[in-house]
UniProtKB/Swiss-Prot annotation:
This is Large ribosomal subunit protein uL16. Keywords: Ribonucleoprotein, Ribosomal protein, RNA-binding, rRNA-binding, tRNA-binding. Gene3D superfamilies: Ribosomal protein L10e/L16. One of its GO terms (cellular component) is cytosolic large ribosomal subunit. PROSITE patterns: RIBOSOMAL_L16_2. Binds 23S rRNA and is also seen to make contacts with the A and possibly P site tRNAs. Belongs to the universal ribosomal protein uL16 family. It comes from Aliarcobacter butzleri (strain RM4018). The keyword rRNA-binding applies. One of its GO terms (biological process) is translation. Part of the 50S ribosomal subunit. HAMAP family: Ribosomal_uL16. One of its GO terms (molecular function) is structural constituent of ribosome. It comes from the Bacteria.
């Protein structure tokens, strides 16, 4: 699973996820990609499930880039625990996703196979996404 090697602080405040993505909103390496259309949070298990779905579909012919990294700790208290007694322990690592953010990129295969593989990965994500290409990436969200 993806997670930082070390952080300055173990726990982080929840914060807010507002606005559009100003960086990471265009294809950097590949010819096809998955772009977020709405706000959301992606965790390391969802990233890994999407990566496995894509690579199995293309049978390792394509190069896949993961353009997101979960760097925010999400805490949870144990079940049947009373309120209080401090913040819970770190449960999983997530990344806040803003609309316009490219999550995955792919190159090295035809457009039809790439669209099928990216569609499989899109089903693993908890927010609405769309497939973009080098030609269509400048469209509105």
């Amino acid at each position: 699973m993806l997670m930082p090697k070390r952080t300055k602080f173990r726990k982080m405040m929840k914060g807010r996820n507002r606005g559009m993505a100003h960086r990471g909103n265009s294809l950097a390496y590949g010819d096809f990609g998955i772009k977020a259309v709405e706000h959301g949070r992606i965790d390391s298990r969802q990233i890994e499930a999407s990566r496995i779905a894509m690579t199995r579909k293309v049978k390792r012919q394509a190069k896949v880039w993961i353009m997101v990294f979960p760097d925010k700790p999400l805490t949870a208290k144990p079940l049947e625990t009373r309120m209080g007694k401090g913040k819970g322990s770190v449960d999983k690592w997530v990344m806040n996703i803003k609309p316009g953010r490219i999550c995955f990129e792919m190159a090295g295969v035809g457009e039809e196979l790439a669209r099928e593989a990216l569609a499989l990965a899109m089903h693993k994500l908890p927010f609405k996404t769309k497939i973009v290409t080098r030609d269509s990436e400048n469209e509105l969200y």
